Amino acid sequence: MKHKILISSALAAVTTLALPVQAQVVTGTLGAPSATTTIEGKQLPNPDPKFGGVIKDEALQSTPWWAPRIVPPAAAPNVLLIITDDSGFGVPSTFGGVIPTPTMDRIAAQGLRYNRVFSTALCSPTRAALITGRNHHSAGFGVISEQSTGFPGYNSIIAQDKATIGRILLDNGYATAWFGKDHNVPAFAASQAGPFNQWPTGLGFEYFYGFIGGDANQWQPNLFRNTTQIYPFQGSAPGQWNLVTAMADDAIDYMTRIHQIQPDKPIFIKYAPGATHAPHHPTKAWVDKISAMHLFDDGYNKLRDKIFANQKAMGIIPQNATLAP
């Protein structure tokens, strides 16, 4: 099965996915429980099909009929969409930065680097635009959710007619999941009492493992699985349990589970770690690893000169670009 990894920054780059539209195809015996179909996707949600069986006064004279189960087109890719907080355009080595991101580098070498994507200077608006493919005002997020005003475009509510990528792919047969930060829940709905229609599970993501709001303590986060609060860090020694690692482990478990049960079912994951947003709680292993690289010893000015030169050499910025004073 093909795979696609899309990587985004809340302040840098955003990418979107487009799959080719195919005519409806039914596999198996139409009306049988095992029948499947692809859909054109011109209408969302897809209308329910009419009953194709026969109903008579007696059961023996009647014919049962099951609607074909919707599945994606053959060879539909797995998609991993990563969005990080407060990490600029020139942070990862993939875009000329000094932070080594070798896996992203390998992926980019076989794919595309986007450098002209709309991004706001705020968290919630960028995320709303990313998951809906619309201007952030159209998705209700002119500001972050905590500053919503109750006016159109600023009420922090993603309307039902603004389908998320998760909803669209779920309706087309994907398994969908959201890991990490969700800063697109209205403040009045951000508790254990809900309502949950604006949480990931209400927006087309079947599985959610993460936190609601702009930031989280990475050692003891306000953590949820779907809409139930969980406390996996309880009983751990200080500095032992960390959300960054736990979130990655849970995402791997999720992908493994789906592929073991239904290997041909593609997966869409929105992966949104919050660790690069304050409060910063890296593990000792990461602190030691990055410190040993001495990446920032030359100071800010020399660092930005180096990144700027790297980006020109990689063709990420125009050759005639000039560095701001």
Describe the predicted segments one by one.
Residues T37, K42-P325:
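Formylglycine-dependent sulfatase
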